[in-house]
Amino acid sequence: MPTKICVTLDGGYVRALCKQSNKPPKDPRYIEKIAHACRTPEEVIHRIMFYDSGGFSGTAKQPVSGQTKQFTANDKWLHELSYKDLLSIRLGVLKFRGFVLNPARIPYTPGQPLTDTDFYPDFEQKGVDMRIGIDMANLSANRSVEVIALATNDTDCIPAMKHARRSGLQIALICFHGFRPAPELLAHTDFRRNIAWPT
């Protein structure tokens, strides 16, 4: 009998690594390829869980001019991703935290006035680790899978990982080529699963 697994992808983490590796971060077909690369030939995917937040839509006053800046989210790629086989999307919320001075302007040079372009918007993803934890607890309770293949670098997931292992499930931490996971995560993992970027 093949081993049933749930592939659990922290979207913010996966997209960040895609950008650093010159891979398409919001291509539904490529994300699907990544998910399938997380299983071994002896395993069958029960479900693919993709956790992310939609884009931010709203307005904010720019830090220098005081003019209003409009933010418009484009979440078409998430809708397309949701139609993929076996894939379920869990969305957190993206919060706007203000504008941050570009490090290139630090330290500030007198005589060079700052402009709005010297600042970039700062966003924070909320609720994703909580949703990962809830779903891992549900998988532990109903025992619908034997292995959770987890792609994240968020140490807030450790309590859920510990609970799943105590319940008899195995955790395979997905390690992408060229990137090192947090040591704390490895301490609560059954397997370190190294994968190459799909072509």
Protein language model regions, located:
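Nuclease catalytic cores that cleave nucleic-acid phosphodiester bonds
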Residues: 90-199
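Domain-level signal for Mg2+-assisted phosphodiester chemistry and nucleotide/NA-binding surfaces
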Residues: 1-107, 116-121, 170, 176
